[in-house]
Amino acid sequence: MKNNCETGQQSLAINSNKKVAIKDGGIIFSTLMLLPAILHFLVLYCGVNLNSILLAFSVPKSDGGQEFSLYNFQRFFANMANPESQVYMALFNTLEYYLLKVCKYALTSIVSYFFYKKLPGHIAYKILFFLPSMIPDMVYISIFKQFISKYGPLYEFLGLFGYKMPSLLLEPSTAEGVIMFYHFWSGFGPQLLIQVGAMNRIPSDVIDAAKIDGCVGFKEFWFIILPLVFETIATYFLLGIVEIFQSTGPFLFFVGSDMPEVYTLQYWIFQQTLGGASNYPAAIGLVFTMLALPLVLISRYFINKVETVTY
């Protein structure tokens, strides 16, 4: 009896040691796997952004050094009070692109449902929406510019009705609208693929049961489809909030860098940094980072409040 107890205690001790060894080995393995990502975060994110924060609170001195100052922030708030400043216009354009992105998310869900139900004409619409995604941007934009150019196909067509179309890309007021239209139309491809894929995963039994209860058409879309693919839509929405101040469009392909009225905040900061002015852009980046952070956290909080549907 005594030998059996000793044997049992030894077995327990061996099993306990094995569990500790496995646990320690798992921790070491996990640490080694995460080490490259941690180093990448520390060097390329924390290191770079720490330098940006220091630049935001400093101004260049005559001897080439830097001195502490709040001038960059004072300049920013002064520019934001002036609608004619480049920063103000760049921010306004950026928010326009973001609102366009939100509208595109909503329309993508409707178009995805159209494809999911395989309604008449869905193949033609697939070609129409996916074509810009399959052809390189530079090629497709060149074709699009020729189509809307003076004496181009659109110009000649409108001329049949007595309307002489102006050069749309020469004036900021019309150039921005053309660029946003192209950006809106050409960005459906990837989102459509993901949302249609999410809808195709819905069990047919769920759809059949909804039809028996009289849930068809818009009711099916609103009460059945949307709740079941909400996680996919919410992920896109949250990513959009993260990039709210980074929204931009392909305006460089259309008008180059000679039209500041169509700049977005992201490109304006890049252009300023390229010209050697790092302090003021760093301050602007810091301000909008501090604005975006609570927006992301609040949005995530309310998204998590929505009850997810599993199937």
State what each model feature region is:
Residues 22-311:
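A structural signal for multi-pass alpha-helical bundles of membrane permease subunits
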Residues 1-24:
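Short, Lys/Arg-rich, polar N-terminal cytosolic tail immediately upstream
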